[in-house]
Amino acid sequence: MLRRLSLREKGEEMDVLKISSKSNPNSVAGAIAGLVKETQRAEMQAIGAGALNQAIKAVAIARGFVAPSGVDLICVPAFAEVQIEGEDRTGIRLIVESRK
């Protein structure tokens, strides 16, 4: 499952891809490649080991999608505090940016 969540950060509208353990890495990779081509940046949020595994695989696949055009991807991990059904959870936010 792949869901987009719109956030406002630093005065800009930003899409955050919410990744689950059931997310298809190829679909997520396509979304990452599209966002990076469009905005030079993509953000993902994963909660749990399975979701993080799918997110990392997606970054590797997306890198293969954009590499032929001379774009390299870098990935910066960060912790994210998320509220789910009133309960605080710690997740991982992956910020993917292009590097030429």
Which role does the model predict for each range below?
Residues M1-E13:
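Short, Lys/Arg-enriched N-terminal segments with co-localized hydrophobic residues
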Residues M14-Q40:
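An N-terminal amphipathic alpha-helical segment
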Residues V36-N53:
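Short glycine-rich, basic-tinged beta-strand/loop micro-motifs
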Residues V36-Q40, A62-V66, R93-V96:
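Short, low-complexity, polar/charged sequence segments that are solvent-exposed and flexible
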Residues A49-C75:
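Short, hydrophobic/π-rich interface segment
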Residues A67-K100:
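C-terminal edge-of-domain segments
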